[in-house]
Swiss-Prot record:
The lineage of its organism: Archaea, Methanobacteriati, Methanobacteriota, Archaeoglobi, Archaeoglobales. It comes from Archaeoglobus fulgidus (strain ATCC 49558 / DSM 4304 / JCM 9628 / NBRC 100126 / VC-16). It comes from the Archaea. This is Uncharacterized protein AF_0194.
Length: 25
């Protein structure tokens, strides 16, 4: 697996989790 792809996936996952917390307030 490409380390860049793994890092990008982790960043996107964390971003989605943060966005979810913001929406919940």
């Amino acid at each position: 697996m490409d380390s860049k792809a793994v890092l990008k996936g982790m960043l996107e996952k964390a971003y989605r989790i943060e966005a979810g917390f913001e929406k919940r307030g």
